[in-house]
Regions:
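Accessory alpha/beta interaction modules
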Residues: 1-156, 171
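Low-complexity, glycine/alanine/valine/leucine- and proline-rich hydrophobic stretches
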Residues: 147-156, 164-166, 176, 180-185
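Short, charged alpha-helical interaction segments and adjacent helix-coil junctions
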Residues: 2-17, 21, 25, 83-88, ...
Length: 269
């Protein structure tokens, strides 16, 4: 019995040793430290005076139909606005619609019935991924709604910021993102992140909560692999149907959550 327990502890230690801030299981633990989230947001939002009043890691909210949305780090800032920070490793869904959906749920959740729209709180969504959702060369992309005809910005109080660890453009934000890929951080520019990661990894023995998180993480990764394999299988089927002229390319591309031009490259390749 004692031997099995020691083996289990070693397995947990091995898994935790490989975890990085970009891994949602570790990010969930790191987000319990408000000062850490503050450090990260000050870099990404390029505002050294930002204050985080509260943060709820792995917060769950529901829409009107009862569907739950789990938010990695749901923050209230010092000026009364809200910020949701998410980390994403899996590239098997429409990320822009995911961000839009989560933002709508957050807005509905923090707005009281009968409240004037002028009083709706500002919201920033920070979406951190291991890949570049824009397939460009930048580390960070700022998006806001604009009028097509004039280019004027729509003052709706909402902004989505997409940050990735893939592109290193030499900026301070890119430096932070490279730390998100490391199992050990030794960068004096981000002392709270470095120290908190060390603390989490050094406090494993006897930590039942961490053991449970590791087990949940293993199960979640297995489920993600299953979804990715199913998505790949569906994509192959759609390509075959288009090649056999049994399905229109536009419809197939829509079902694959891709543009028609991107989908046709797969068909022709």
């Amino acid at each position: 019995m004692k031997k099995r327990k020691l083996e289990h502890q070693r397995e947990v230690q091995d898994v935790v040793a490989q975890l990085r801030p970009i891994d949602d299981i570790m990010f969930q633990r790191l987000c319990e430290n408000i000062l850490l989230i503050e450090e990260v947001l000050r870099v990404i939002l390029e505002d050294g005076k930002i204050k985080v009043k509260s943060v709820i890691p792995q917060s769950s909210i529901q829409n009107l139909h009862g569907r739950s949305v789990v938010l990695d780090a749901y923050c209230k800032l010092g000026d009364g606005s809200y910020c949701n920070v998410e980390v994403q490793r899996s590239d098997s869904d429409n990320h822009f619609k995911r961000v839009r959906y989560n933002a709508a749920c957050i807005t509905a959740n923090v707005t009281d019935p009968g409240e004037r729209f002028e009083q709706v709180k500002d919201l920033i969504v920070v979406y951190i991924s291991e890949f570049d959702v824009f397939h460009g060369k930048a580390t960070i992309y700022h998006t806001r709604m604009r009028a097509d005809e004039t280019g004027a910005r729509v003052p709706d109080g909402y902004q989505a910021i997409y940050v990735n660890t893939k592109n290193n453009d030499g900026s301070r934000i890119a430096e932070l993102m490279q730390c998100f890929l490391q199992t050990e951080i030794d960068n004096p520019n981000f002392p709270i992140l470095a120290e908190e990661l060390r603390a989490e990894k050094g406090n494993i023995e006897g930590d039942e909560a961490m053991c449970k998180i590791v087990e949940d993480y293993a199960e979640k990764r297995a489920q993600e692999r299953g979804r990715e394999e199913r998505a790949a299988g569906m994509q192959d089927t759609l390509i075959a149907l288009v090649k056999e002229k049994l399905l229109a390319p536009a419809i197939a591309a829509q079902k694959a959550n891709m543009s028609e031009s991107e989908f046709m490259k797969l068909v022709q390749g």
